[in-house]
Amino acid sequence: MTETFKHQSVLLKETVDALNVQPDGIYVDATLGGGGHSEYLLSQLTTGHLYSFDQDDHALESSRQRLAKYADAGQVTFIKSNFRFLKIALAEQGITKIDGILYDLGVSSPQFDDAQRGFSYKKEAPLDMRMDQGAELTAYTVVNEWSYQQLIKIFFRYGEEKFSKQVARKIEQQREIAPIETTIQLADLIKEAIPAPARRTGGHPAKRIFQAIRIAVNDELGAIEDSVEQAIPLVKVGGRISIITFQSLEDRLVKTMFKEQATLPDIPKGLPIMPGTEKTVLKLVNRKPILPTEDELTVNHRAHSAKLRVAEKQKEID
C-alpha cells in the first residue's frame, strides 16, 4: 500500500519550521497526505503529540506505515475526517487548544496519478473527483445533472474560465444525446468548446474546468473557510498557522482570512485606545508569501504554484 501513495511534500522545512515547534507541544497536520510534513514535525517532538487528518483512506493507510514508529510511541493520532470538522474531531480527542497547525491544500500527487480517481484530464477514468470516496457527490453528477446556469456559475467562480458559457452549452448539448461518462470525453468536449486561438495559450484547455468541478465536488473553498475559522480560536497565543496554497482562489481566501484577523478595527477619531486593544488576533509572520526555491522547483515541478502564508496568534478573539 505504501507504494501507492508516494507524495513529495512541497515547502516541507519552511512550513514546519515556521510553526516554531515546541518539543512538548500539541500540533495538527490538517492534510496528512503522504505524511512528509507530519514526519518532519514528529521528528522534533519529545513529549508532544501530533493529530493528523485526512479523508482519503489510501493516504491514511500509507502514512500509518510510514509513521509507524511514532504511532507505536504514542506520539501521533490519525483522524479520518475532512478538516472542516477540525474542532469537533479534536474535542473528541479531548483537545481544546493546540500550539500550531499546518495545511497543505489541494489534491496530492497520488490522487492525480491514480487515473481511476478521475482528477486528471489526461487519463481515461470515470468522472469521480471525490477526495473522500465515501462522499455521495461525484463529478459525474455535476457534469450530467447540474443545470446550465449552475455549471456556468462554478466554471466562472472556481475555474475563472472566460469561456464558461461555451463549455456549459457544449456539455448540455452532449448530455441530451448521451451521458458524459469519462474524463477524456469531458476533456475533448471542453477542447471543442474553447476557440482555437485560446487553446494555444495558458496550458491544457481543460485545466480550469476540471479544477472548478473538483472544487465543487469537494466544496474545497467552503471547507478551507470552515476549518481556518475554527483553527484561529483553537491555536494558543504564540502559536502559529502555516498554510500552503496552490491556486489563486485558495490563496486569496487564506490571505483575506488572515488579513481580517491581523487588522485593527477602525477607531473613531478622538476616541482613546484602551490598553491591550492595540493588538490584533493574528500577526502576519511574512507580509508576502514564501515561495519554493529554485532547487525545489528543479526536483518537484508540482511546487511551481505553491505559496506559503504564516500567521501567529497574538491574542484571543474577544
Swiss-Prot record:
Pfam families: Methyltransf_5. Its EC number is 2.1.1.199. Keywords: Cytoplasm, Methyltransferase, rRNA processing, S-adenosyl-L-methionine, Transferase. It catalyses: cytidine(1402) in 16S rRNA + S-adenosyl-L-methionine = N(4)-methylcytidine(1402) in 16S rRNA + S-adenosyl-L-homocysteine + H(+). Its main location: cytoplasm. It is found in: Cytoplasm. GO terms for cellular component: cytoplasm. GO terms for biological process: rRNA base methylation. GO terms for molecular function: rRNA (cytosine-N4-)-methyltransferase activity. InterPro entries: RsmH (IPR002903), SAM-dep_MeTrfase_MraW_recog (IPR023397), SAM-dependent_MTases_sf (IPR029063). Specifically methylates the N4 position of cytidine in position 1402 (C1402) of 16S rRNA. Belongs to the methyltransferase superfamily. RsmH family. This is Ribosomal RNA small subunit methyltransferase H. It comes from Latilactobacillus sakei subsp. sakei (strain 23K). The lineage of its organism: Bacteria, Bacillati, Bacillota, Bacilli, Lactobacillales. The gene is rsmH.
